[in-house]
């Protein structure tokens, strides 16, 4: 055993991991991908995209303490989807097509089988998003993390024609707001979720509940974050949307106002969509107020589109063609005085 191994770092486990993930990484290749796994830097050829005035849009994010749920359940094959989703959905909100992705995994001990499961999830997220996994880093840090602990973060870059870049100046008065259904909690609010489940109560994650269709609580909580690229990017390319909001930490209350200018207000009808059972369960179990819920969770809406009234039917048709569940949840109007930028009825 080398002195480095005695110190807790096994470089041979790193080599083993690279061999295990090669197939998954290769499966994400797309137009513009160059090079192979193992290079010092990931490369991508922008010239093949034939974009006249390219604007690069980048995003970086992690999965937060949802990772602790995955580690508690010893289920690591979907958490990578969450990591990709958190990055590429943010990029999509600016109208950009995600091109490539890089991941960063930090752990107390490099277990090649476990890390390969995580990377398999990252690769699945990349395939869903049409983005290439062009690089990554696995850092073994025995004094920083416990043996079975790990953290996961990602970085992605996308591109958009300058004329199609979505900013808060695009949405207009009388725009219709379309909410796209979430798959569950997604990747935000898990510190509160864990407080409710494990500190305020002693919930067994393997318990199956009728309101969850027979799924266990753990399965519902770990449901991967939706990736909206396939259904929304075509709308952007056809100039059918004026704005996009990715509903993450802070829920609708914090994220929707980021989409439009300060002279507008979003009027939201909370009865216009079905709140997912997991949120009703957490609200009751945690004795949460309505404000607590809407300021923390997505409440069943993972993304919101601002659409001109004359383009509404075209958007609805294209979303339906993609089997996207959506709801008309409100509209934008002129803001009166110092009222809030979002009003939920």
UniProtKB/Swiss-Prot annotation:
EC number: 6.3.3.1
Pfam families linked to this entry: AIRS, AIRS_C
Keywords on record: ATP-binding, Cytoplasm, Ligase, Nucleotide-binding, Purine biosynthesis
Cellular compartments per GO CC: cytosol
InterPro entries in the record: PurM-like_C_dom, PurM-like_C_sf, PurM-like_N, PurM-like_N_sf, PurM_cligase
Biological process annotations from GO: 'de novo' IMP biosynthetic process; adenine biosynthetic process
Major site of localization recorded for this protein: cytoplasm
One GO molecular-function entry: phosphoribosylformylglycinamidine cyclo-ligase activity
Entry-linked Gene3D superfamilies: PurM-like C-terminal domain, PurM-like, N-terminal domain
Keyword Signal appears in the UniProt entry: no
Coiled coil: none
Catalytic activity: 2-formamido-N(1)-(5-O-phospho-beta-D-ribosyl)acetamidine + ATP = 5-amino-1-(5-phospho-beta-D-ribosyl)imidazole + ADP + phosphate + H(+)
Pathway as given in its UniProt record: Purine metabolism; IMP biosynthesis via de novo pathway; 5-amino-1-(5-phospho-D-ribosyl)imidazole from N(2)-formyl-N(1)-(5-phospho-D-ribosyl)glycinamide: step 2/2
Family: Belongs to the AIR synthase family.
Name of this protein: Phosphoribosylformylglycinamidine cyclo-ligase
Protein encoded by which gene: purM
